[in-house]
Amino acid sequence: MLGAYAEGHDLHTLTAQSLTGREEIGKDDRKLAKAVNFGLLYGMGAKGLQVYALKSYGVRMSLEEAALYRRRFFETYPGLKRWHDNQRRVWQRGQTETRTLTGRRRLDVEKLTDRLNTPVQGTGADGLKLALALMWERRSECPEAVPVLVCHDEVVVECNAEQAANVRSWLERAMVEGMDVVLNRTDEVDVPVEVEVRIARSWGESG
C-alpha cells in the first residue's frame, strides 16, 4: 500500500482492479472498492462487509462474494494483513491501550475494531489538528481567510472571491505540512501527502 502511494496510484482504482480482475474500471467498480477499502481497513468480516457495502454505498454482494473480496483485498495489501494480525495478537493478550502515530493514547480499548481504527483515524485527526495550528500561526500570511467549519477531514474557509487562489495555496500548504509531520516522523517511511482543495460558493457546491 505504501508503494502504491509512493508511485502515485489511486488506491480505489487499484483495489477495484484487484477485486474485478479488470484493468478498465467504471463508476460502480470504484464504489465497490471504496466499500471494501473503508470496511476492511477496520477489521470487518465478510458479513460486516456485506451489510456495510449495501448501507453505505448501495453495493449489493452475496456473502460468498464478500468473502472473496476480503481475501483478494488482503492479497493485494499483505502489509496491512500483517499489521491486522499483529494487532489481533496484542488484543488477544488483553492489551487495552493503543496509540496514534504521534503517541496519543487511547485507553480501555475492548474491541478489536477499535484497536484497528484508532491508529488510522486518530492519526488523521492529529494531522488535521496540526494543520489547524499551522493555519493559526500563519494567519498573518492570509488575513482575509476565515475558517468557519471543520468536519471529519475537511476544513471550510471563507474569503472574498478575488482572494480565493491565495487562500487555496495557504490552506493546502498547512494541510500537507501538518499531515507530513505526523506520517513521516522517522526515516523509515516516506509517505507522500496529497490534499484536495476546491473553490466554490458554498460547502455544498464543493462536493
Locate the predicted segments by residue.
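Conserved catalytic core of nucleotide polymerization and phosphodiester-bond processing enzymes
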Residues: 1-207
